[in-house]
UniProtKB/Swiss-Prot annotation:
Pfam short name (any one): DHO_dh
Family membership: Belongs to the dihydroorotate dehydrogenase family. Type 2 subfamily.
Pathway the protein contributes to: Pyrimidine metabolism; UMP biosynthesis via de novo pathway; orotate from (S)-dihydroorotate (quinone route): step 1/1
Protein's recorded name: Dihydroorotate dehydrogenase (quinone)
Species the sequence originates in: Bartonella tribocorum (strain CIP 105476 / IBS 506)
Entry EC no(s): 1.3.5.2
SUPFAM superfamilies linked: FMN-linked oxidoreductases (SSF51395)
Molecular function via GO: dihydroorotate dehydrogenase (quinone) activity
GO biological processes: 'de novo' pyrimidine nucleobase biosynthetic process; 'de novo' UMP biosynthetic process
Amino acid sequence: MSFFRCIGRSALFMLDPEHAHRLAIVGLKSGLNGCQKVVDKRLSVTIAGLKFKNFIGLAAGFDKNAEVVDEIFRLGFGFTEIGTVTPKPQIGNPKPRLFRLKEDEAIINRMGFNNDGHQVVDDRLRICKKAGVVGVNIGANKDTVDKIDDYTVGIAHFYDVADYFTVNISSPNTPGLRDLQARDSLHLLLNAISKARKEQEKKHGFSIPIFLKIAPDLSEKELDDIAEEIKLSDFDGLIVSNTTLSRQGLNNSHFSNEEGGLSGRPLFERSTIVLAKMRQKLGKEIAIIGVGGVKDAQTALEKVKAGADLIQLYSGMVYEGPNLVITILKEILQMMQQDGVDNIKDYRDHNLEHWAKFPL
């Protein structure tokens, strides 16, 4: 058992979750975790025209305001995603809004896109060294009537500083946001964003990849609709998935009835099933980033085997500590050596049929 699990986690878990998160940000700024790297070309992946040093990224939500972009790469991540960022700053939902379900190694949040807004985050990004790929996760303000417009504004604002965009329409904590996943609304959204990208591409002379982040709480028909719209659009891929509203499989936790999106270990199965189904529906060429319940080398590799090109994690680091990524990468390399695998991408789709067969 790691030092973090023995000592550090107990100390941090005595604090309110938001206070602990703030302390983690401050600690990273102070360089308390040193610098850790696992550099091996067998872990590198190229998708959507971007080369990732390794296949593990930090999911949006940890570094909402681009405060520790450079520091994140010292933890071993191959890429990071800041945000979700909205055009105007907003404070989010009332506190308490973040809850640890320790028995389940899970988190429930109803943060509500609390962030510093486009301009402040943009200013911070422009002074980063960017030791790896940095994505910008964009969203809509709670009080915005035309939410699609907020996304096109985000594309324009960050176009010359982002390595890729994530269009987040799947958070359960902004009223009406998930409605944009419905086919008619999604069609309008994807067209508007594609138009915004083309305008910026003409202006700047290069194209930035765009991913759509979807919820796990979707029916087979809804997944079919999303897949068809993605194939009709010029989007580069999907991120599967955001947090879930389901509480299936939880222990009788004190906080299990709190409203908000659930992440962590209980999300792994559902998100991996949705991932595999979307890989089947989209085919081999469209990129997919798998996220949800990754906590060790086994769960990380299973995402790839279910169809992911890259993976992201966040909640796993809360429970396993800042050395998690390094540990996963080292163990994955050992697995590759044992299996005679030349590159992590060679594992992709190995268990696709297994995961895709499960009902939603």
